[in-house]
Amino acid sequence: ELYPNLYRDETAVRLIDQIDYDFSVAEKNSRSLMQRFGALEVAMRQCDLAWEVRDYLKTHPCAAVVNLGCGLDNTGRACDNGSCKIYNLDFPDVIALRQQLLPAGEREQNIPCDLKDPA
């Protein structure tokens, strides 16, 4: 919400209202210069990543978008071109929460796994 002209994540805005969590401490901390700089850095990185994914999908429309350690990030869906497949991978408890809040779409899979497990 600090830099909506740079990157506006409507899903995150919706989830903040949906999740039973007191964000007041985070909001208070967001006033510091370091926190604002960190938020700017994250917004810029997210904007760049989304641009790269969309650009790649222009020339590879049926590609797979793989989001490792996805949490509640919705970049794959935000960049969806209508043809790609989206794979969101994270720990089982994270994927369980994701399934509740962001159920997988038609060409999307939420995959529970431990990315540190070499098996």
Predicted regions and their residues:
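Rossmann-like AdoMet
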Residues: E1-V66, C70-C113, P118
